[in-house]
UniProtKB/Swiss-Prot annotation:
Its main location: membrane. The chain crosses the membrane at residues 15-35, 61-81, 88-108, 112-132, 146-166, 184-204, 240-260, 274-294, 302-322. Belongs to the binding-protein-dependent transport system permease family. FecCD subfamily. It comes from Salmonella newport (strain SL254). GO terms for cellular component: plasma membrane. GO terms for molecular function: vitamin transmembrane transporter activity. GO terms for biological process: cobalamin transport. It is a multi-pass membrane protein. The complex is composed of two ATP-binding proteins (BtuD), two transmembrane proteins (BtuC) and a solute-binding protein (BtuF). It is found in: Cell inner membrane. Keywords: Cell inner membrane, Cell membrane, Membrane, Transmembrane, Transmembrane helix, Transport. This is Vitamin B12 import system permease protein BtuC.
């Protein structure tokens, strides 16, 4: 038993080290790649000062943080709702952020600055989160809370569709592209959004013990002494914050929160002490690579990153499911 535990620990360490190395390599690729390839040796030149430090670096940092946030949100939701199909958009939080953003564009008539739009997106996500907490205070079961989140997401999606369909505002029509996900408008002015993500990401990565208990099921978690109502509310708020900030920076991006935790579990990383940092690293890698593809796939335009993540990720996910079923 001791030998097996040591082997498992070494295996987990190897996984985390490998993912950390891949994050570094993906970051280097993201900083170099673009319409003009800029090798690391040219980063201190005048061209590198503009393209790498002013354009690509803030974008790369945003992609890293959003990828980690979405993957961690998926891992938390899958443990919280005991459902491997749970993901950040499932509770309607992503759509709530979109409704907040669209309301800001309509009420501000396109005159609000970017930071104000970001705050409205976060506010929309947190409003949906507070509504979910209202349901949670009624001590609903996890399955009922999940259904409530799905219903809220449908309502928010309908509101966004109606607003965009009847709008003549060019800014609002541009939001349709934004809601597909993209980092094209990210620069150092969005650094406050990046900073807002970091403490929550670190805190979530340290919550392996309650999440391990929650993954055992509600009954087992109660028997182990976990204050279920408190932790469920706290984790829903943290997830709402991460998703709201992510949507404010990059729009709605699917696949990452659903598939990354599932892939790591299929690879044997089931303990949240390893799964949480693993999800943060793997989510950052996946979104960085998808962002590079989105930038380079077309010569004259940039693909929505949400389209890239779904196109690249769905076949891999199906292959892993078929492999695990054999």
């Amino acid at each position: 038993m001791l030998t097996f535990a040591r082997q498992q620990q070494r295996r987990n360490v190897r996984w985390l080290l490998s993912l950390s190395l891949l994050v570094l390599l993906a970051t280097l690729l993201s900083l170099c790649a673009g319409e003009q390839w800029i090798a690391p040796g040219d980063w201190l030149s005048a061209r590198g000062e503009l393209f790498v430090w002013q354009i690509r670096l803030p974008r790369t940092l945003a992609v890293l943080l959003v990828g980690a946030a979405l993957a961690l949100s998926g891992a938390v939701m899958q443990a919280l709702f005991e459902n491997p199909l749970a993901e950040p958009g499932l509770l309607g939080v992503s759509n709530g952020a979109g409704v907040g953003l669209i309301a800001a564009v309509l009420l501000g008539q396109g005159q609000l600055p970017g930071w104000a739009l970001g705050l409205c997106a976060i506010a929309g996500a947190l409003i949906i989160t507070l509504i979910l907490l209202r349901f949670a205070r009624r001590h609903l079961s996890t399955s009922r809370l999940l259904l409530a989140g799905v219903a809220l997401g449908i309502i928010c999606s309908a509101l966004m569709t109606w607003a965009i369909y009847f709008s003549t505002s060019f800014d609002l029509r541009q939001l349709m592209y934004w809601m597909m996900g993209g980092f094209g408008g990210v620069d150092w002015q969005q650094s406050w959004l990046m900073i807002a993500l970091i403490p929550v990401l670190i805190w979530i990565c340290c919550q392996s013990q309650p999440l391990n208990m929650l993954a055992l099921g509600e009954t087992s978690a109660r028997q182990l002494g976990l204050p279920l109502w408190f932790w469920r509310n706290l984790l829903v708020i943290a997830t709402g914050w991460m998703v709201g900030v992510s949507v404010a920076m990059a729009g709605a991006i699917g696949f990452i929160g659903l598939v990354i935790p599932h892939i790591l579990r299929l690879c044997g990383l089931t303990d949240h002490r390893v799964l949480l940092p693993g999800c943060a690293l793997a989510g950052a890698i996946a979104l960085l690579l998808a962002d590079v593809v989105a930038r380079l796939a077309l010569a004259s335009a940039e693909l929505p990153i949400g389209v890239v993540t779904a196109t690249l990720g769905a076949p891999v996910f199906i292959w892993l499911l078929l492999k695990s079923a054999r």
